């Protein structure tokens, strides 16, 4: 593996870990609200969350580039320029992977039901206690699935990160873009090495999710 590829690998892991952490922090309250609310316009929020699933990555990346660019709304408000930077990659990755984190969490909170929370309320548990000691433990499979899917999806990003970050070695060049560069230069050996590594890693992560969820169902029974 070339030093540039190793740098891209480290950058990709850093991006995936940070994006997944941020997604879990902001996605948990959103998923909890979506699972509990009776607001009749909830479907609009759910549609916004799911939008990255159907939008072409280049479309999402284009509008994020405008938002984060030198003449974008963020810069005009004094937020600076985040395009073609690692911070911009994190911002774009969080938006692009949001449905892969929020939807499993929402499903897990809904599957837990209201009954355990009502029982905890009769024992005088505060809303915070009910959330952290009842809802979150019951939704553990959803958290595992959300974390793994968010992480794996971020690792495999191409269109969005290319649009927002370009292809700057050591700064915004992630593994998927490095693979593309190797294919363009007909360096199939390096492309095989990186692609195979991502393939194996993705399979291991998904297998771990299914194994963990199966174990949780067995323990629940």
How should each PLM-predicted stretch be described?
Residues 37-45, 73, 85, 115, ...:
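Membrane-helix interface segments
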Residues 21, 102-105, 109, 113, ...:
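Transmembrane alpha-helices
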Residues 82-121, 134, 146-147, 207:
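Membrane-cytosol interface at the C-terminal ends of specific transmembrane alpha-helices
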Residues 61-94, 164-168:
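Membrane-interfacial helix termini and adjacent extracytoplasmic/periplasmic loops
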Residues 1-7, 164-203, 207-208:
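Interhelical loop and adjacent transmembrane-helix boundary motif
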Residues 33-64, 117, 141:
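Cytoplasmic-entry segments and transmembrane alpha-helices of multi-pass inner-membrane transporters
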Residues 41, 106-125, 133, 192-221:
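C-terminal transmembrane helix and the adjacent membrane-cytosol boundary/short C-terminal tail
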Residues 5-34, 94:
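Transmembrane alpha-helix signature in integral membrane proteins
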């Amino acid at each position: 593996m070339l030093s540039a590829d190793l740098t891209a690998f480290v950058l990709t892991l850093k991006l995936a870990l940070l994006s997944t952490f941020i997604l879990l922090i902001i996605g948990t309250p959103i998923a909890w609200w979506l699972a509990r609310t009776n607001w009749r316009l909830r479907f609009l929020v759910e549609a916004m969350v799911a939008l990255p699933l159907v939008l072409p990555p280049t479309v999402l990346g284009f509008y994020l580039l405008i938002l984060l660019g030198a003449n974008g709304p963020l810069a005009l408000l004094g937020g600076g320029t985040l395009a073609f930077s690692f911070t911009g990659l994190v911002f774009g990755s969080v938006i692009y992977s949001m449905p892969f984190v929020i939807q499993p969490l929402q499903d897990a909170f809904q599957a837990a039901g209201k009954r355990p929370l009502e029982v905890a309320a009769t024992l005088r548990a505060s809303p915070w206690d009910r959330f952290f000691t009842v809802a979150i433990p019951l939704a553990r499979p959803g958290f595992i699935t959300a974390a793994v899917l968010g992480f794996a999806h971020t690792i495999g990003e191409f269109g969005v990160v290319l649009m927002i970050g370009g292809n700057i070695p050591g700064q915004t060049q992630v593994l998927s873009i490095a693979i593309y560069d190797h294919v363009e230069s007909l360096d199939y050996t390096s492309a095989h090495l990186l692609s195979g590594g991502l393939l194996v890693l993705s399979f291991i992560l998904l297998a771990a999710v299914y194994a963990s969820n199966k174990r949780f169902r067995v323990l629940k029974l």
